Amino acid sequence: NVTRELKHLIDTLHQNQMECVMEMYFEQEENQNLILDALRYWATEFRVDGFHLIGENVPITAIAQDLYLRRSKIFYQYIPEQLWKEKEHYPHLFVYNDEYLYTGRKLLNHQGGSLFEFGNQQKKQNKTVGFVNFMANNNGFTLADLFSYCEKHNEANGEENTDGSNYNFSINCGTEGKTSRKYVKELRRKHLYMALSMVFFAQGVPLLLAGDEALNSQQGNNNAYCQDNKIGWVNWKRNTGMEALQEF
């Protein structure tokens, strides 16, 4: 029974002090009451710990104030101004968007970055809601690929490399993809360490993509959701430099 297996999986995660946050996409024309009902169902029936919501018509104000969802972590790209102005705090509500990602990448990779904007991103925090900061997430390059590829390489997805974002602000440090050149590998290492330092020294909540701590690569694919193979899998094997990165 699929339902029973999923519930068992989530319970097992909880027993091991891990949480399950679902990424859910809703179409523009989706009924807002249906969205609320769906979130309540997953929160109460499956006991998921939160939701990363994607879509332009998500009723985020109603979700933030819903009694059934007050214990669920809610991640969304935009928080309405009226919530910012309320005296009530929303400790379960988090701003999740690409502002930090683009600001950090532009500055680190010398692609038109702004120290002023980076400073604002580093110190942004609010008593009403939280902020999530990241340089890589599940919808783009891995952290290792961010400094190994100037261009996306999504040919294996079967869409002639037209899928996935073209705005990556990535850098290959001198060679596209894998290399044995020591100076290129050292430059990539420095960039990666600086990226992690930026995220973890910021005041917001740091997010680290699974596998980035092991230098996982998707071979330059920045839209690998359809790759149920070595491209899309997280490689937990010992990579050169992995132990040094984790020690860092």
State where each predicted segment sits.
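Aromatic- and acidic-residue-enriched segments that line the glycan-binding/catalytic groove
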Residues: 1, 26-33, 87-93, 220-230
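Acidic/aromatic-lined carbohydrate-recognition and catalytic surfaces
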Residues: 1-36, 40-82
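The substrate-binding groove and active-site-proximal loops of carbohydrate-active enzymes
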Residues: 1-3, 26-33, 47-56, 107, ...
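Generic alpha-helical structural signal
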Residues: 7, 36, 193, 246-247
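Conserved alpha/beta catalytic core and glycan-binding cleft of carbohydrate-active enzymes
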Residues: 47, 59-210, 214-215, 223-225
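Acidic/Ser/Thr/Pro-rich low-complexity tail/linker regions in eukaryotic proteins
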Residues: 169-170, 232, 244
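Catalytic cores of secreted or luminal carbohydrate-active enzymes
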Residues: 240-248
